[in-house]
Amino acid sequence: MAEGLRAPPPPGNGSECPDGARWVLRLLGECARDGRDVGSALLGLLSIGCFAAAALPQFYQACKTGIMDRALSIYFLLGWLGGDLLNLIGSFLANQLPLQVYTAVYYVLADLVMLSLYGYYKAKNWGTGATASINAACLFCLLGTATTLTVLSHDTGPAPNPAAFGGRSLLSLGLEGPGPEPISKTEIIGFAIGSISSVLYLCSRLPQIYTNYRRKSTAGVSFLLFALVMLGNLLYGTSVLLKNPEPGQSEGDYILHHLPWLIGSLGVLSLDVIISFQFLAYRTGQPSAGEEREALLAEHGDS
């Protein structure tokens, strides 16, 4: 079956993306041939804006309430970081769109800050009684930093040239054209890693849903974090779907090539909707963040 993995042929000789939008080519290294491609680039940039802003409300909420270690599940944060790390590695290896690589880099950086805050408040509120959680957070922070620096030390792709926009397609069979280029093993590994990252994204929400249910409270968790992530995932997935397939590549092959990243963005929306309903269900009758923090410290002092 490996013999059937082929990439579409290059679009041919000529100038680099002659009919494309120049600003998209310069900014993202993508060839936007028509309004559909330009719209995809715009939605992708908006999604990055949502992701960039999403973590800020949670950072503020953490500093305001001081109970981030109780409000957020460590397994939610670790699962999120694990998915983002694999997403970054998979995007790089599978020759994904530059926008996907840039978004993955920001994901990891924001996760590292979030885990650092979690470890800080865990140590502050529990002293030496939370060594395992803090060690796990530190380990993942180091792993995330090393992975991000390794990826950033390489180019995310070659300089734009006529063949750079040929794209690659898994299971693209029977394409006409002389000498189709085989899909590399590296790209297949990247596709597999991207698939695993999608599973981690889906599973990461479950511990947070359980934590909210167990506490019967969402105090200390910023609703804007999930609202902006939901909007960002929706825009991100739509931008990938909106983009035209490369010449010689069918719509089905294009979707298959980007499927893990689509599941990782659009697939988690249903779970984020559940968390949004929890904010509505627990908004009345729940203790304030200050009361919960005082109770937490009193409980720790009695132990």
Curated annotation (Swiss-Prot):
It is found in: Lysosome membrane. The lineage of its organism: Eukaryota, Metazoa, Chordata, Craniata, Vertebrata. PANTHER family: LYSOSOMAL AMINO ACID TRANSPORTER 1 HOMOLOG, SEVEN TRANSMEMBRANE PROTEIN 1-RELATED. Residues 60-73, 118-131, 204-220, 282-303 are cytoplasmic. Residues 36-102, 186-251 form the PQ-loop domain. Amino acid transporter that specifically mediates the pH-dependent export of the cationic amino acids arginine, histidine and lysine from lysosomes. It comes from the Eukaryota. It is a multi-pass membrane protein. A motif (Di-leucine motif) lies at residues 296-297. The di-leucine motif mediates lysosomal localization. Its main location: membrane. Gene3D superfamilies: 1.20.1280.290. GO terms for biological process: intracellular amino acid homeostasis; L-arginine transmembrane transport; lysine transport. Belongs to the laat-1 family. GO terms for cellular component: lysosomal membrane; organelle membrane. Residues 1-38, 95-96, 153-182, 242-260 are lumenal. Glycans are attached at residue 13. This is Lysosomal amino acid transporter 1 homolog.
